[in-house]
Amino acid sequence: IEAVSSAIKMTRAGLGNTDKPIGSFLFTGPTGVGKTELARQLAFTLGIDLIRFDMSEYMERHAVSRLIGAPPGYVGFEQGGLLTDAVTKKPHAVLLLDEIEKAHPEIFNILLQVMDHGSLTDNNGRVADFRNIILIMTTNAGARATQSHALGFAKATVSQDNSEEIKRAFSPEFRNRLDATVQFTALDEDIVLRVVDKFLMQLEEQLHEKKVDIHFTNALRKHLAKDGFDPLMGARPMARMIQDTIRKALADELLFGKLKNGGTVHVDYSESEQKVVFDVQLPRKKETEKVDALV
């Protein structure tokens, strides 16, 4: 976060390189630790668009033409490229290239031009301006080194092995044009609790639209943080756990149960019963309804 924010502050202060994107970053680390989420939150905080490409869709050599447009005489020449058109329409954005290691090596050659000169020419000769783009690429390369040394090895050894995998996956000219390679490590206990609060806050906002107030106990939060987090899989299993234990039960109450007209729910975790328990309270009737009932 500090590396990304420093690049943005230098650009806002007029001290950045005006011929390059605001920043070019490679996020590395295991799955489910927040690499993609950081890009989303960065775009949200800055109030700019997020342009996301899943690079697993660009594993073939001909996929390059989808990004910059097909050459003359080929199908799709009139349509232009997905990448160049997206940046032309939204010149101030966070460009997220997810799982970049899965892309064809030819795509890396295109990114060299973007990172070095802040521009890219499409099939029609139009130049897309990347100078106001924050380029973020994510990769799981190096995650195996982190997992294999999860027990009994020093952090320096893990970091060294991680760097070696990055060097094998990406060419020197590609790595040399990056502003920073940001290594994400496994989430600690405090961060996991914050992730729990984030997921529960999302659920609270969704239920608020249904006129339902929901409250969660600390026992539930600690239970989700302990049993819903997997060091190898990250925070994604926690979302599935919340869906299986809380969301499904609330869905039945919203559609067929006590919460059809709103209400209040208290969600707790019972250590003795080893399960999530719900306390549903019906909504209070309005004063006007009470008056009508008396009449």
Model-derived segments and spans:
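AAA+ P-loop NTPase nucleotide-binding core of proteostasis motors
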Residues: 1-295
